[in-house]
């Protein structure tokens, strides 16, 4: 998700608990995952929440220019409207338009998908390189597992009970 847009999710926590390094933006639970297991054991890319905020406040983002100036991105975008994915070439026209021109009064590419494209592609190259080092990959996996305790349901329930619900733990004998 775009940095600053996602409150949190649990899917990536489940992946972490099972040893998968995270590939994603520094947003939502990814922030906590990186804090626990380290940036070196995950693959973070894209704009920061501060950069997104600055673009939202100051403007200056032109998805058309990003598409034209990012190697391969125009080909990816054109594949949405040239019949690559469906003989109904209009099937993805609204998606294309939302990213390049904006629709329904919204600005174009409001989630900065095109802006993050190059970082996403580079992150995948880093994943591919890291995966070739089996020992290094196993170390990343183990460090993700070993540092995933923060996401335990027991810890979460205790924290919610005391900080949100204002109830005490009941000892069962």
Which residues fall in each region the model found?
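Catalytic binding pocket for nucleotide-activated donors in carbohydrate/polymer assembly enzymes
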Residues: 1-141, 145-150, 155, 159-173
């Amino acid at each position: 998700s775009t940095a600053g847009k996602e409150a949190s999710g649990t899917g990536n926590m489940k992946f972490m608990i099972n040893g998968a390094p995270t590939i994603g933006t520094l947003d939502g639970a990814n922030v906590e995952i990186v804090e626990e297991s380290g940036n070196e054991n995950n693959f973070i890319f894209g704009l920061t929440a501060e950069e997104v905020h600055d673009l939202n406040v100051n403007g200056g983002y032109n998805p058309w220019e990003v598409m034209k100036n990012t190697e391969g991105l125009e080909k990816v975008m054109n594949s949405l409207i040239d019949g690559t994915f469906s003989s109904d070439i209009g099937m993805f026209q609204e998606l294309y338009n939302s990213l390049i021109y904006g629709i329904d009064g919204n600005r174009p590419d409001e989630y900065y998908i095109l802006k993050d494209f190059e970082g996403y592609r580079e992150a995948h190259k880093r994943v591919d390189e890291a995966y070739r080092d089996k020992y290094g990959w196993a170390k990343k996996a183990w460090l993700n597992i070993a540092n995933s305790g923060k996401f335990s349901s027991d810890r979460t329930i205790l924290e919610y009970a005391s900080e949100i619900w204002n109830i005490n733990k009941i000892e069962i004998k």
